[in-house]
Swiss-Prot record:
GO terms for cellular component: cytoplasm. The lineage of its organism: Bacteria, Bacillati, Bacillota, Bacilli, Lactobacillales. GO terms for molecular function: DNA binding; DNA-binding transcription factor activity; GTP binding. GO terms for biological process: negative regulation of DNA-templated transcription. Disulfide bonds: none annotated. The keyword Transcription regulation applies. This is Global transcriptional regulator CodY.
């Protein structure tokens, strides 16, 4: 009982992680590593579309074919659809089960391999699945308790991250709207011309050349750039005689300009 309590506390301590610490390519790798260590298993966290948010391989079970899925950070659609139909934890699925995470070509190598899938919920919504597996050791009741707690903890973190992302999107959109509202017609025209000059989200431009091309003064372009930069939409740096280096850091400006085209 003491061991179970200790492991439970280690899992719930994951909630103390800030959302900022999850802003990475595989934001849940650290969490998956902890779960794999605590429960003694391999662990994989996927979202509702099968995107791999994080995984930990304590034991090697993948073939080269399956390893490609993990490297691509996306599980096969058929498998994801089947996993999404699980509404309660399915424990100790054998290698013969369609939902086994073990590669079909390695069934003879890991005949006793077991997979457990726990749905991840947050705010009443299905957010993904927690998949854990072992080569030969059955997940007992204590393990299943830890798995249920783990899926709840991950669900809370996923929901927190979604909320954070939504707030960031709203903040960026508000900044764009406020900046657009301060632009005159000529400045709006200048912004559209400037962004068309960029190679993707960044590039070098010469204000005087753009001004002559669209029939406005150079000062209009300078004012427009200053307003966008103060709103946190772009970053600029003078290159002297070579012009100005510009980088868009709030990409929503591209979509916003389409509304005015």
């Amino acid at each position: 009982m003491a061991n179970l309590l200790s492991k439970t506390r280690r899992i719930t301590s994951i909630l103390q992680r800030s959302v900022e610490s999850l802003q990475s390519d595989l934001p849940y790798n650290t969490i998956a590593d902890q779960l794999a260590e605590i429960i003694d298993c391999n662990a994989c966290i996927i979202d509702g579309s099968g995107i791999i948010l994080g995984y930990a391989m304590k034991y090697k079970t993948n073939t080269d074919r399956v390893e490609e899925f993990f490297q691509a950070k996306k599980l096969p659609d058929d498998y994801v659809k089947s996993a999404s139909r699980i509404y309660d934890t399915e424990a100790n699925l054998s290698v013969e089960n369609d939902l086994t995470i073990f590669p079909i070509e390695s069934k003879d190598i890991y005949p006793d391999g077991l997979t457990t899938i726990a749905p991840i919920y947050g705010g009443g919504m299905r957010l993904g699945s927690l998949i854990i597996w072992r080569n030969d050791k059955e997940f007992n009741d204590d393990d299943l308790i830890l798995i249920e707690i783990s899926s709840t903890v991950v669900g809370i973190q996923l929901l927190n991250l979604q909320t954070e992302n939504l707030e960031e999107t709203i903040r960026k959109q508000t900044a764009i709207n406020m900046a657009i509202n301060t632009l005159s017609y000529s400045e709006m025209k200048a912004v559209a011309a400037i962004l068309n000059e960029l190679d993707g989200n960044e590039g070098r431009l010469t204000a005087s050349v753009i001004a002559d091309r669209i029939g406005i003064t150079r000062s209009v372009i300078v004012n427009a750039l200053r307003k966008l930069e103060s709103a946190g939409i772009i970053e600029s740096r003078s290159l002297g005689m070579k012009g100005t280096y510009l980088k868009v850091i709030n990409e929503g400006i591209f979509d916003k300009l389409k509304d005015y085209s």
